[in-house]
Amino acid sequence: MHEMSIAEGIVQLLEEQAVAQDFTRVRALWLEIGPLAAIEVESLRFCFEAVTRGSLAEGARLEIVELPGRAWCLGCNASVAIRRRYDACPQCGSHRLQVTQGDELRVKELEVE
């Protein structure tokens, strides 16, 4: 379950930012996650709740913003929507796709005190 190490990394990032930006508590956290990031959202929620106990993010609301997956098709030279990494191009059926969006995991916004 790599979601645990991801949650731990998020808490570490929050602690670093708390020092740099002078806040003491995280009330809410918005994460952008793409469908190609290989992250189980419910597992991440569970792990986040577990690793934030006793930290500045304990009790913080975790909001997930799901990004769409997009790729550039080398077969028809079009930007297309995809749900999985190995989807075929919905326009021409080619599998020669380069992912351009959807494999992200990033902190979008924080609400802090």
UniProtKB/Swiss-Prot annotation:
It holds the Pfam family HypA. One of its GO terms (biological process) is protein maturation. The keyword Metal-binding applies. InterPro entries: Hydgase_Ni_incorp_HypA/HybF_CS (IPR020538), HypA/HybF (IPR000688). GO terms for molecular function: nickel cation binding; zinc ion binding. PROSITE patterns: HYPA. Ni(2+) binds at residue 2. It comes from the Bacteria. Keywords: Metal-binding, Nickel, Zinc. Belongs to the HypA/HybF family. Involved in the maturation of [NiFe] hydrogenases. Required for nickel insertion into the metal center of the hydrogenase. HAMAP family: HypA_HybF (MF_00213). This is Hydrogenase maturation factor HypA. It comes from Azotobacter vinelandii.
